[in-house]
Swiss-Prot record:
It comes from Burkholderia pseudomallei (strain 668). InterPro entries: DAP_epimerase_AS, DAP_epimerase_DapF. It catalyses: (2S,6S)-2,6-diaminopimelate = meso-2,6-diaminopimelate. This is Diaminopimelate epimerase. Pfam families: DAP_epimerase (PF01678). SUPFAM superfamilies: Diaminopimelate epimerase-like. The keyword Cytoplasm applies.
Length: 289
């Protein structure tokens, strides 16, 4: 079967986007997702995005996200920005703002006149059981309004914030994000048994109260050039710890995101993420068996 696709990226976090809205697509297996995402024998991507018709009232579209390891995940901020550019560029909507069904709910995406996309990422969740994170038997320590949890990582105790942005995140503050051994500690944190669904590991360097450098080792994808939900989780943790003030400029290897959150006043407030979305190319590929 021939499969039309669009290759896109948001701040270097790259995606294969498939249109299941205007055409019927067969259910994709994990092996097929891995083959399409393979950078040597397929198209190459951190994740695959599938555009579908919504199944809930009040949503314009539904989108599903698959990591390059073939597993389906809950949310992707950079993918959400690419999603709204895709549906507008392909004439699926003329709206500047669309409501999109994702695995954990409905989010609102808005295309700005300057081409950037603003995503209402929803409110962060800090309760360990809802992340989910097993904090049983651990003695946390308070910093600001946050609780930091000790996690043994390669023989060293790391103090982490746990945050859900619809997907689980473990955030730690480091002195130098560029020099930190992200690809050593990242896999150990991702698969720590206290995270039953595994976790995205964020390593944040605070540059000023409005600026950070961030690297994220993503669950099922490894280190990526940018992670939208990771940026939101890091900023939320930093504000809650009293280290940051909104808005925050987040520098990643792939580009810059702007995160705003009024959480110092109301932790139920949604995080707003602004950043670019870029189409790289379009093509046709034979769907692997």
């Amino acid at each position: 079967m021939k499969l039309s696709f669009t290759k896109m990226h948001g701040a270097g976090n790259d995606f294969v986007v498939l249109d299941g809205y205007t055409r019927a697509l067969p259910p994709l297996t994990g092996a097929q997702v891995r083959a399409l995402a393979d950078r040597h024998f397929g198209i190459g991507a951190d994740q695959l995005l599938l555009v579908e018709k919504p199944t809930v009232d009040g949503a314009d579209f539904k989108y599903r996200i698959f990591n390059c390891d073939g597993g389906e995940v809950e949310h992707c901020g950079n993918g959400a920005r690419c999603f709204v550019k895709f549906v507008r560029d392909h004439g699926l909507t003329g709206k500047a703002s669309v409501r999109v069904e994702v695995k954990h709910g409905v989010i609102t995406l808005t295309m700005q006149d300057n081409g950037e996309v603003v995503v209402d990422m929803g409110a962060p969740v800090f309760e360990p059981a809802r992340v989910p994170f097993d904090a049983s038997g651990l003695d946390g320590r308070r910093e600001g309004a946050d609780t930091l949890w000790p996690l043994p990582v390669n023989g060293v105790t790391r103090w982490i914030s746990v945050v859900s942005m619809g997907n689980p995140h473990a955030v730690q503050i480091v002195d130098d994000a560029e020099a930190f051994a992200v690809r050593v500690d990242g896999p150990a944190i991702e698969r720590d048994p206290r995270f039953p669904q595994r976790v995205n590991a964020g390593f944040m360097q605070v540059v000023s109260r409005h600026e950070v450098n961030l690297r994220v080792y993503e669950r099922g994808a490894g280190e990526t050039l940018a992670c939208g939900t990771g940026a939101c989780a890091a900023v939320a943790a930093g504000i809650r710890r009293g280290r940051l003030d909104s808005p925050v400029t987040v520098h990643t290897h792939g580009g810059t995101l702007t995160i705003s959150w009024n959480g110092a006043r109301d932790e139920r407030a949604p995080l707003m993420m602004a950043g670019p979305a870029t189409t790289v190319f379009e093509g046709v590929i034979e769907l692997p068996a």
